[in-house]
Design a protein with these regions (language model features):
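Short, surface-exposed acidic/glycine-rich loop or hinge patches that mediate macromolecular interfaces
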Residues: 11, 21, 49-50, 232, ...
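A short linear hydrophobic-aromatic micro-motif
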Residues: 33-36, 285-286
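Conserved helicase motor core of SF1/SF2 NTP-dependent helicases
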Residues: 42, 97-109, 113-227, 231-330
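N-terminal presequence-like segments and adjacent domain-start helices
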Residues: 1-14
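Interdomain "pre-motor" coupling segment immediately N-terminal to P-loop NTPase/helicase cores
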Residues: 29, 36-91
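Primarily NTPase-proximal linker/entry elements flanking Walker-type ATP/GTP-binding cores
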Residues: 77, 86, 92-106
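Short amphipathic alpha-helix segments
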Residues: 11-31
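Hydrophobic side chains in well-ordered alpha-helices
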Residues: 23, 55-58, 238
Protein backbone atom coordinates (compact mmCIF):
# COMPACT_ATOMS: atom_id res chain seq x y z
CA UNK A 1 0.00 0.00 0.00
CA UNK A 2 1.32 3.43 -0.93
CA UNK A 3 0.21 6.95 -0.03
CA UNK A 4 -0.07 10.05 -2.18
CA UNK A 5 -1.14 13.68 -1.64
CA UNK A 6 -2.97 15.52 -4.42
CA UNK A 7 -3.18 19.31 -4.11
CA UNK A 8 -6.13 21.21 -5.61
CA UNK A 9 -4.32 24.36 -6.74
CA UNK A 10 -6.65 26.16 -9.13
CA UNK A 11 -10.09 25.85 -7.54
CA UNK A 12 -12.06 26.50 -4.39
CA UNK A 13 -12.16 23.13 -2.53
CA UNK A 14 -15.66 23.94 -1.26
CA UNK A 15 -17.00 23.83 -4.84
CA UNK A 16 -14.99 20.71 -5.64
CA UNK A 17 -16.11 18.78 -2.55
CA UNK A 18 -19.74 19.87 -2.97
CA UNK A 19 -22.50 20.75 -0.52
CA UNK A 20 -22.01 18.72 2.68
CA UNK A 21 -19.05 17.03 0.92
CA UNK A 22 -21.46 15.25 -1.43
CA UNK A 23 -19.01 15.24 -4.36
CA UNK A 24 -16.07 13.82 -2.45
CA UNK A 25 -18.34 11.18 -0.90
CA UNK A 26 -19.43 10.12 -4.39
CA UNK A 27 -15.80 9.98 -5.54
CA UNK A 28 -14.98 7.78 -2.55
CA UNK A 29 -17.88 5.48 -3.43
CA UNK A 30 -16.59 5.14 -7.00
CA UNK A 31 -13.15 4.15 -5.69
CA UNK A 32 -14.04 1.67 -2.90
CA UNK A 33 -10.57 0.05 -2.86
CA UNK A 34 -8.87 3.32 -1.93
CA UNK A 35 -8.75 5.13 1.39
CA UNK A 36 -9.42 8.80 0.64
CA UNK A 37 -9.15 11.70 3.10
CA UNK A 38 -9.85 15.27 1.96
CA UNK A 39 -8.81 18.24 4.10
CA UNK A 40 -8.55 21.79 2.84
CA UNK A 41 -7.11 21.70 -0.66
CA UNK A 42 -5.25 18.41 -0.12
CA UNK A 43 -6.63 14.97 -0.93
CA UNK A 44 -4.69 12.15 0.73
CA UNK A 45 -5.16 8.75 -0.91
CA UNK A 46 -3.83 5.32 0.06
CA UNK A 47 -4.07 2.01 -1.76
CA UNK A 48 -2.93 0.04 -4.79
CA UNK A 49 -0.60 1.97 -7.12
CA UNK A 50 -2.53 1.21 -10.33
CA UNK A 51 -5.84 2.21 -8.75
CA UNK A 52 -4.25 5.39 -7.38
CA UNK A 53 -2.96 6.39 -10.84
CA UNK A 54 -6.48 6.11 -12.24
CA UNK A 55 -7.78 8.11 -9.27
CA UNK A 56 -5.23 10.89 -9.79
CA UNK A 57 -6.10 11.16 -13.49
CA UNK A 58 -9.78 11.47 -12.57
CA UNK A 59 -9.08 14.18 -9.98
CA UNK A 60 -7.03 16.18 -12.50
CA UNK A 61 -9.82 15.92 -15.08
CA UNK A 62 -12.46 16.88 -12.49
CA UNK A 63 -10.36 19.85 -11.37
CA UNK A 64 -10.01 21.10 -14.96
CA UNK A 65 -13.77 20.83 -15.42
CA UNK A 66 -14.37 22.70 -12.16
CA UNK A 67 -11.96 25.49 -13.13
CA UNK A 68 -13.73 26.01 -16.45
CA UNK A 69 -17.36 25.75 -15.35
CA UNK A 70 -17.18 26.83 -11.67
CA UNK A 71 -19.34 23.82 -10.81
CA UNK A 72 -19.12 20.06 -10.46
CA UNK A 73 -22.30 18.06 -10.92
CA UNK A 74 -22.99 14.45 -9.97
CA UNK A 75 -23.41 13.27 -13.57
CA UNK A 76 -20.13 14.94 -14.57
CA UNK A 77 -18.25 13.14 -11.79
CA UNK A 78 -19.64 9.78 -12.91
CA UNK A 79 -18.88 10.42 -16.59
CA UNK A 80 -15.30 11.56 -16.00
CA UNK A 81 -14.44 8.72 -13.61
CA UNK A 82 -15.92 6.21 -16.06
CA UNK A 83 -13.83 7.73 -18.85
CA UNK A 84 -16.73 9.30 -20.71
CA UNK A 85 -16.95 12.85 -22.06
CA UNK A 86 -19.44 14.83 -19.93
CA UNK A 87 -22.58 15.91 -21.77
CA UNK A 88 -22.32 19.69 -21.46
CA UNK A 89 -25.03 21.95 -22.84
CA UNK A 90 -23.80 23.81 -25.93
CA UNK A 91 -23.04 27.41 -25.01
CA UNK A 92 -22.02 29.03 -28.32
CA UNK A 93 -19.79 32.07 -27.82
CA UNK A 94 -19.23 31.58 -24.08
CA UNK A 95 -16.33 33.66 -22.77
CA UNK A 96 -16.24 32.20 -19.27
CA UNK A 97 -18.65 30.69 -16.74
CA UNK A 98 -20.05 32.56 -13.74
CA UNK A 99 -19.72 31.37 -10.15
CA UNK A 100 -23.16 29.79 -10.52
CA UNK A 101 -22.05 27.87 -13.61
CA UNK A 102 -24.01 30.01 -16.08
CA UNK A 103 -22.26 30.96 -19.34
CA UNK A 104 -21.17 34.58 -19.74
CA UNK A 105 -21.61 35.37 -23.42
CA UNK A 106 -21.45 38.49 -25.61
CA UNK A 107 -24.96 39.93 -25.58
CA UNK A 108 -24.68 42.18 -28.61
CA UNK A 109 -22.94 42.32 -31.97
CA UNK A 110 -20.36 44.84 -30.73
CA UNK A 111 -19.61 42.84 -27.59
CA UNK A 112 -18.94 39.85 -29.84
CA UNK A 113 -16.70 42.08 -31.96
CA UNK A 114 -14.75 42.99 -28.81
CA UNK A 115 -14.21 39.28 -28.11
CA UNK A 116 -12.97 38.62 -31.65
CA UNK A 117 -10.68 41.68 -31.71
CA UNK A 118 -9.18 40.58 -28.38
CA UNK A 119 -8.14 37.32 -30.02
CA UNK A 120 -6.44 39.17 -32.92
CA UNK A 121 -4.89 42.26 -31.30
CA UNK A 122 -2.83 43.07 -28.21
CA UNK A 123 -4.41 46.47 -27.54
CA UNK A 124 -8.11 47.25 -27.80
CA UNK A 125 -10.00 50.49 -27.20
CA UNK A 126 -13.68 49.85 -26.39
CA UNK A 127 -15.73 53.05 -26.32
CA UNK A 128 -19.41 53.18 -25.46
CA UNK A 129 -22.15 54.38 -23.10
CA UNK A 130 -22.82 53.16 -19.56
CA UNK A 131 -24.33 49.69 -19.52
CA UNK A 132 -23.04 48.65 -22.94
CA UNK A 133 -21.01 45.82 -21.39
CA UNK A 134 -17.57 47.01 -22.45
CA UNK A 135 -15.91 46.66 -19.02
CA UNK A 136 -17.74 43.46 -18.04
CA UNK A 137 -16.82 41.79 -21.34
CA UNK A 138 -13.21 42.95 -20.98
CA UNK A 139 -12.95 41.48 -17.47
CA UNK A 140 -14.52 38.21 -18.65
CA UNK A 141 -11.86 37.97 -21.37
CA UNK A 142 -9.12 38.59 -18.80
CA UNK A 143 -10.51 35.92 -16.45
CA UNK A 144 -10.66 33.44 -19.34
CA UNK A 145 -7.01 34.11 -20.20
CA UNK A 146 -6.02 33.61 -16.56
CA UNK A 147 -7.96 30.35 -16.27
CA UNK A 148 -6.40 29.10 -19.50
CA UNK A 149 -2.95 29.99 -18.09
CA UNK A 150 -2.22 32.24 -21.07
CA UNK A 151 -1.17 34.98 -18.62
CA UNK A 152 0.10 35.19 -15.04
CA UNK A 153 -1.93 38.12 -13.74
CA UNK A 154 -4.81 40.51 -14.29
CA UNK A 155 -4.39 44.21 -13.55
CA UNK A 156 -7.45 46.45 -13.42
CA UNK A 157 -7.13 50.21 -13.11
CA UNK A 158 -9.19 53.40 -13.08
CA UNK A 159 -8.41 57.07 -12.66
CA UNK A 160 -8.87 57.66 -8.92
CA UNK A 161 -10.84 60.89 -9.21
CA UNK A 162 -14.29 61.02 -10.77
CA UNK A 163 -17.31 63.30 -10.59
CA UNK A 164 -15.31 66.15 -9.07
CA UNK A 165 -14.43 64.38 -5.79
CA UNK A 166 -10.95 64.75 -4.36
CA UNK A 167 -9.38 61.83 -2.50
CA UNK A 168 -7.75 64.04 0.10
CA UNK A 169 -11.12 65.18 1.42
CA UNK A 170 -12.56 61.68 1.79
CA UNK A 171 -12.40 59.87 5.16
CA UNK A 172 -10.22 56.82 5.88
CA UNK A 173 -6.87 55.48 4.72
CA UNK A 174 -5.87 55.15 1.06
CA UNK A 175 -7.67 51.80 0.63
CA UNK A 176 -10.88 53.28 2.09
CA UNK A 177 -10.56 56.27 -0.24
CA UNK A 178 -10.04 54.36 -3.49
CA UNK A 179 -12.20 51.26 -3.00
CA UNK A 180 -15.51 52.99 -3.89
CA UNK A 181 -14.02 54.02 -7.26
CA UNK A 182 -12.94 50.45 -7.94
CA UNK A 183 -16.06 48.64 -6.67
CA UNK A 184 -17.56 48.04 -10.16
CA UNK A 185 -14.43 46.06 -11.02
CA UNK A 186 -14.74 43.97 -7.83
CA UNK A 187 -18.40 43.32 -8.67
CA UNK A 188 -17.56 41.90 -12.09
CA UNK A 189 -14.79 39.68 -10.71
CA UNK A 190 -17.11 38.35 -7.99
CA UNK A 191 -19.51 37.21 -10.72
CA UNK A 192 -16.79 35.11 -12.37
CA UNK A 193 -14.44 33.84 -9.66
CA UNK A 194 -15.50 32.06 -6.43
CA UNK A 195 -15.00 34.26 -3.36
CA UNK A 196 -12.28 32.17 -1.71
CA UNK A 197 -10.29 31.89 -4.93
CA UNK A 198 -10.67 35.60 -5.69
CA UNK A 199 -9.40 36.47 -2.22
CA UNK A 200 -6.40 34.18 -2.75
CA UNK A 201 -5.67 35.70 -6.17
CA UNK A 202 -5.73 39.19 -4.70
CA UNK A 203 -3.56 38.28 -1.72
CA UNK A 204 -0.99 36.79 -4.11
CA UNK A 205 -1.25 39.82 -6.44
CA UNK A 206 -2.36 37.53 -9.27
CA UNK A 207 -5.30 39.92 -9.58
CA UNK A 208 -4.51 43.55 -8.83
CA UNK A 209 -6.95 46.46 -8.70
CA UNK A 210 -5.38 49.87 -8.33
CA UNK A 211 -5.74 53.55 -9.24
CA UNK A 212 -4.01 54.62 -12.43
CA UNK A 213 -1.33 56.56 -10.55
CA UNK A 214 -0.04 53.27 -9.09
CA UNK A 215 0.96 52.09 -12.59
CA UNK A 216 3.82 54.59 -12.91
CA UNK A 217 7.29 53.04 -13.21
CA UNK A 218 6.03 49.49 -13.81
CA UNK A 219 6.53 47.14 -16.76
CA UNK A 220 3.58 44.78 -16.99
CA UNK A 221 4.53 41.38 -18.42
CA UNK A 222 2.38 38.27 -19.01
CA UNK A 223 -0.81 40.06 -18.04
CA UNK A 224 -4.14 41.37 -19.19
CA UNK A 225 -4.31 45.02 -18.17
CA UNK A 226 -7.62 46.88 -18.26
CA UNK A 227 -7.96 50.65 -17.92
CA UNK A 228 -11.58 51.55 -17.17
CA UNK A 229 -13.14 55.04 -17.31
CA UNK A 230 -10.25 56.14 -19.53
CA UNK A 231 -12.15 59.25 -20.65
CA UNK A 232 -11.06 60.76 -17.32
CA UNK A 233 -7.34 60.42 -17.99
CA UNK A 234 -5.10 63.26 -19.07
CA UNK A 235 -2.81 62.94 -22.09
CA UNK A 236 0.17 62.28 -19.82
CA UNK A 237 -1.71 59.66 -17.79
CA UNK A 238 -2.92 57.57 -20.72
CA UNK A 239 0.49 57.75 -22.41
CA UNK A 240 2.07 56.57 -19.15
CA UNK A 241 -0.43 53.71 -18.93
CA UNK A 242 -0.07 52.51 -22.53
CA UNK A 243 3.72 52.49 -22.31
CA UNK A 244 3.61 50.10 -19.31
CA UNK A 245 2.91 47.26 -21.76
CA UNK A 246 5.40 44.41 -21.47
CA UNK A 247 5.93 41.05 -23.16
CA UNK A 248 2.97 38.66 -23.61
CA UNK A 249 0.57 41.34 -22.40
CA UNK A 250 -2.78 42.51 -23.69
CA UNK A 251 -4.34 45.87 -22.86
CA UNK A 252 -8.01 46.84 -23.01
CA UNK A 253 -8.93 50.51 -22.60
CA UNK A 254 -12.59 51.32 -21.97
CA UNK A 255 -14.34 54.67 -21.77
CA UNK A 256 -17.51 56.67 -22.26
CA UNK A 257 -17.07 59.97 -24.10
CA UNK A 258 -20.32 61.31 -22.62
CA UNK A 259 -19.03 61.06 -19.03
CA UNK A 260 -15.85 63.13 -19.05
CA UNK A 261 -15.36 64.55 -15.54
CA UNK A 262 -12.12 66.44 -16.19
CA UNK A 263 -12.02 70.23 -15.78
CA UNK A 264 -13.28 71.97 -18.93
CA UNK A 265 -9.79 73.36 -19.56
CA UNK A 266 -8.30 69.86 -19.72
CA UNK A 267 -8.52 67.58 -22.76
CA UNK A 268 -9.38 63.91 -22.35
CA UNK A 269 -6.36 61.69 -22.90
CA UNK A 270 -8.65 59.04 -24.38
CA UNK A 271 -9.93 61.39 -27.08
CA UNK A 272 -6.38 62.30 -28.05
CA UNK A 273 -5.15 58.69 -27.93
CA UNK A 274 -7.89 57.57 -30.30
CA UNK A 275 -6.82 60.26 -32.77
CA UNK A 276 -3.06 59.69 -32.39
CA UNK A 277 -3.15 55.87 -32.48
CA UNK A 278 -5.68 55.40 -35.25
CA UNK A 279 -4.17 53.17 -37.92
CA UNK A 280 -1.40 51.76 -35.71
CA UNK A 281 -0.99 48.04 -36.43
CA UNK A 282 -1.97 45.79 -33.51
CA UNK A 283 -4.41 48.33 -32.02
CA UNK A 284 -8.15 47.89 -32.50
CA UNK A 285 -10.93 50.42 -31.87
CA UNK A 286 -14.49 49.29 -31.12
CA UNK A 287 -17.42 51.64 -30.66
CA UNK A 288 -20.42 50.38 -28.73
CA UNK A 289 -23.72 52.27 -28.70
CA UNK A 290 -27.17 52.36 -27.12
CA UNK A 291 -28.12 49.14 -28.94
CA UNK A 292 -25.49 47.34 -26.84
CA UNK A 293 -26.95 48.42 -23.49
CA UNK A 294 -27.90 45.37 -21.44
CA UNK A 295 -29.08 47.03 -18.23
CA UNK A 296 -32.70 47.89 -17.40
CA UNK A 297 -34.64 49.02 -20.51
CA UNK A 298 -34.95 52.49 -18.95
CA UNK A 299 -31.18 52.98 -19.25
CA UNK A 300 -31.45 52.98 -23.05
CA UNK A 301 -34.29 55.51 -22.89
CA UNK A 302 -32.27 57.72 -20.53
CA UNK A 303 -29.24 57.61 -22.85
CA UNK A 304 -31.42 58.53 -25.85
CA UNK A 305 -33.08 61.39 -23.92
CA UNK A 306 -29.71 62.86 -22.95
CA UNK A 307 -28.42 62.49 -26.51
CA UNK A 308 -31.40 64.53 -27.77
CA UNK A 309 -30.91 67.13 -25.03
CA UNK A 310 -27.19 67.49 -25.78
CA UNK A 311 -27.85 67.72 -29.53
CA UNK A 312 -30.42 70.46 -28.90
CA UNK A 313 -27.96 72.37 -26.70
CA UNK A 314 -25.31 72.04 -29.41
CA UNK A 315 -27.70 73.49 -32.01
CA UNK A 316 -28.66 76.36 -29.69
CA UNK A 317 -25.00 77.22 -29.07
CA UNK A 318 -24.34 77.13 -32.81
CA UNK A 319 -27.34 79.40 -33.52
CA UNK A 320 -26.27 81.81 -30.76
CA UNK A 321 -22.78 81.92 -32.22
CA UNK A 322 -24.13 82.67 -35.70
CA UNK A 323 -26.43 85.36 -34.31
CA UNK A 324 -23.56 87.07 -32.43
CA UNK A 325 -21.43 86.89 -35.56
CA UNK A 326 -24.24 88.48 -37.60
CA UNK A 327 -24.75 91.24 -35.03
CA UNK A 328 -21.03 92.08 -35.05
CA UNK A 329 -21.07 92.45 -38.85
CA UNK A 330 -23.87 95.05 -38.78
Amino acid sequence: MIEKHIVLEDIDPVIFYGVNNANIQMIKALYPKLRIVARGNVIKVMGDEEEMCAFEESIIALEKHCVKYNSLKEEVIIDIIKGKTPQIEKTGDTIVFSVTGKPIVPRSENQLKLVKEYEKNDMIFAIGPAGSGKTYTAIALAVRSLKNKEIKKIILSRPAVEAGEKLGFLPGDMKDKIDPYLQPLYDALQDMIPAAKLKEYMELNIIQIAPLAFMRGRTLNAAVVILDEAQNTTTQQIKMFLTRMGMNTKMIVTGDMTQIDLPSSQKSGLVQAMHILKGVKGISFIELNKKDIVRHKLVTRIVVAYEKFEEKQKEERLNDSKKREGDSNK
